[in-house]
Amino acid sequence: MSGYYRYPTINNSKIVFVADDDLWLVELDNPNAIRLTTNLSEVSTPLLSPNGKWIAYVGSEDGNNEVYIMSSEGGPSTRLTYDGSFVSKIAAWNGEDIIFATDLSQPFGRVSNLAKINRKGGPTTLLKYGIS
């Protein structure tokens, strides 16, 4: 597969990346890439969970950039955030929580703070680290 690959994330034998505005998976023992999403909108900054079972990513399927999660085996994505704010990047996993950069509660757009949300859903919690 030739193309322009962006935002690679690696966990053990799995590599997930963005190409053609979708998520793709390659396992080290199988060089064939598998398309995980077929969205009409753009996806970015995927991040595999520490156990390799989940992929958190930024998507704009419903308009705003929001946090989504899906199984690394494929299947449907679940939208986790409904904040209506700009999410720019999935930064890290912390146990069951996904840490991400957002302009939620900022008076000016594109000024980001770190926030977290549980992979099972729930409210977004702003982290008190200042501007990210």
For each of these PLM feature ranges, what is it?
Residues 1, 9, 32, 53, ...:
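Residue-level detector of functional hotspots within protein domains
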Residues 18-24, 38-43, 56-68, 76, ...:
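A flexible loop/linker signature enriched in serine peptidases of the S9 family
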Residues 1-28, 44-46:
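Beta-strand-rich domains and repeat architectures in extracellular enzymes and scaffolds
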Residues 7-12, 45-54, 89-98:
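Blade-terminus and WD-like Trp-Asp/Gly-His loop motifs, strongest in beta-propeller folds
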Residues 11, 32, 51, 76, ...:
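Cysteine-rich, disulfide-stabilized extracellular repeat modules
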